[in-house]
């Protein structure tokens, strides 16, 4: 909270395709969707943010489309599969990490749990047949519940699931957090697990506890760090919470504590009127993070490249970190403009 300002770097295929979620890439190859050909100027990005007073840069290493901006050994749907960029030898996350290390900028990792592309997402047998269906239990023509097909139990569904998405996600966490070339001096201060999921997404339970243990093993006290890694979207393990809107505004009265139940793995941050207001007597400190778009979208595009005015940005500041009783951390997207990449 004392840092006040964090930058949110949204960069990936969506940057080149004028979209936000990447739900319709289908079978397009990395070369078709990731159209970067010139070298990525990470140093200018980080240096500019540092000079502007930002203390942390959170990077979307994998957004909902499933494309990885680092060279991943877990998938070919990544920057190394985009052979038009540095002959398949590029690694954008490594480039940003190197710049953050040189300029001593704290880093956060955004790794979307929802993955539109990877075939392990959801529950399917070896033939690719779905093991879970979305059904209408109220007989009103509106599907409302996911349940196993053909009378299977949930245990049988998990046994017959041909590919384990939770393992895939966990292995990618290890791949990034366990490699010293990623992060500021090999370290991430925060991991962002976005709860967004499209209406047409397959059903998938997340093994959050396993993921949290992995994160802290590398980035927390268990990994010989001074403090545990801050976690966003981590249910009862959340230590950085969403402010409740994407306007950059906190409630007039915002408290930093939430009520969590570790046994039930639930969190209550007193959500009301588009804000998470927190509680004065909650049992867990959860930094309220006020994220906002600096233009009309999270990703840059020709149709959404006009930034908000100084008056609008000033209002965001004063309605988030600018007043002592709001106590929120303000997070703005640092766009990767195609013109900046050289």
Where are these predicted regions, by residue range?
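Mature catalytic domains of secreted/periplasmic carbohydrate-active enzymes
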Residues: 1-342
């Amino acid at each position: 909270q004392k840092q006040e300002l964090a930058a949110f770097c949204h960069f990936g295929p969506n940057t080149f395709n004028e979209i936000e979620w990447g739900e319709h890439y289908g079978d397009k190859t990395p070369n078709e969707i990731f159209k970067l050909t010139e070298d990525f100027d990470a140093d200018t990005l980080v240096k500019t943010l540092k000079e502007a007073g930002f203390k942390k840069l959170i990077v979307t290493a994998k957004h909902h489309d499933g494309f990885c901006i680092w060279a991943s050994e877990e998938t070919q749907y990544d920057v190394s599969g985009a052979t038009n960029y540095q002959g398949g030898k590029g690694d954008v996350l490594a480039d940003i990490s190197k710049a953050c290390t040189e300029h001593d900028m704290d880093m956060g990792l955004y790794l979307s749990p929802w993955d539109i592309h990877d075939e392990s997402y959801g529950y399917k047998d070896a033939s690719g047949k779905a093991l879970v269906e979305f059904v209408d239990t109220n007989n009103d023509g509106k599907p409302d519940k996911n349940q196993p097909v053909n009378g299977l139990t949930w245990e049988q569904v998990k046994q017959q699931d041909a590919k384990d998405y939770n393992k895939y996600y966990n292995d990618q966490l290890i791949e990034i957090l366990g490699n010293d070339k990623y992060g500021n001096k090999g370290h991430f201060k925060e991991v962002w697990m976005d709860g967004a999921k499209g209406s047409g997404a397959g059903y998938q339970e997340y093994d959050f506890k396993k993921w949290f243990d992995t994160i802290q093993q590398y980035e927390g006290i268990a990994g010989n760090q001074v403090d545990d890694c801050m976690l966003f979207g981590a249910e009862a393990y959340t230590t950085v919470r969403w402010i409740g809107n994407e306007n950059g505004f906190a409630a007039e009265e915002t408290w930093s504590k939430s009520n969590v139940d570790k046994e039930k793995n639930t969190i209550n941050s007193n959500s009301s009127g588009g804000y998470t207001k927190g509680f004065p007597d909650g049992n867990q400190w959860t930094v309220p993070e006020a994220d906002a778009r600096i233009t009309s979208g999270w990703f840059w595009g020709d149709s959404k490249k006009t930034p908000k005015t100084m008056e609008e940005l000033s209002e965001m500041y004063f309605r988030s970190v600018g007043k002592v009783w709001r106590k929120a951390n303000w997070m703005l997207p640092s766009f990767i403009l195609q013109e900046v990449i050289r």
